[in-house]
């Protein structure tokens, strides 16, 4: 599972997920999966989608993951009274804004890439779209 090796502070404020995304262009591969909506992806969801794509293309070509879960989400145990500090880190998420390229792929035909990204998209809680690299 993806998570930072070390952080200066263990816990983080909840914050807001506003604004526009960086990394909106396909830069490494030829095809990409771009987020249409905003939300957050957990490390498990990122890994699950990656596995679905890798299995579908039968490990040919190359896949890049363009997102990284760097925000810790805490929760308190069940049946614990309010107060007594912030809970423990349960999982890691990556905040996604519209237009962010989540995954990229190269070395496979477009039809196979579309199918693989459709499988990956089913694993994600965001609306996504298929994009190709624009050649200037």
Curated annotation (Swiss-Prot):
A Pfam family recorded for this sequence: Ribosomal_L16
Name any one GO molecular function: structural constituent of ribosome
Which InterPro entries does the UniProt entry name for this protein?
A: Ribosomal_uL16, Ribosomal_uL16_bact-type, Ribosomal_uL16_CS, Ribosomal_uL16_dom, Ribosomal_uL16_sf
List, alphabetically, the CDD domains matched: Ribosomal_L16_L10e
Name the UniProt key words of this record, in alphabetical order.
Answer: Ribonucleoprotein, Ribosomal protein, RNA-binding, rRNA-binding, tRNA-binding
GO-annotated cellular components: cytosolic large ribosomal subunit
Q: Does the keyword Glycosyltransferase apply?
A: no
- A Gene Ontology biological process annotation? translation
Keyword RNA-binding present in the record's keywords: the answer is: yes
Q: Which HAMAP family match?
A: Ribosomal_uL16
- Outline the subunit composition: Part of the 50S ribosomal subunit.
- UniProt record similarity statement: Belongs to the universal ribosomal protein uL16 family.
Annotated function? Binds 23S rRNA and is also seen to make contacts with the A and possibly P site tRNAs.
Q: PANTHER family in the record, alphabetically? A: 50S/60S RIBOSOMAL PROTEIN L16, LARGE RIBOSOMAL SUBUNIT PROTEIN UL16M
User: What's the name of the protein?
Assistant: Large ribosomal subunit protein uL16
- State which gene encodes it: rplP
């Amino acid at each position: 599972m993806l998570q930072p090796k070390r952080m200066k502070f263990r816990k983080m404020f909840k914050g807001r997920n506003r604004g526009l995304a960086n990394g909106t262009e396909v830069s490494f591969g030829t095809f990409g999966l771009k987020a249409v909506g905003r939300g957050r992806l957990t490390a498990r969801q990122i890994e699950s989608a990656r596995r679905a794509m890798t299995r579908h293309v039968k490990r040919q070509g190359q896949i890049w993951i363009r997102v990284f879960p760097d925000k810790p989400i805490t929760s308190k145990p069940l049946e614990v009274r309010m107060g007594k500090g912030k809970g423990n880190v349960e999982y890691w998420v990556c905040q996604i804004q519209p237009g962010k390229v989540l995954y990229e792929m190269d070395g496979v035909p477009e039809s196979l890439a579309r199918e693989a990204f459709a499988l990956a998209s089913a694993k994600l809680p965001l609306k996504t779209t298929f994009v190709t690299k624009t050649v200037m």
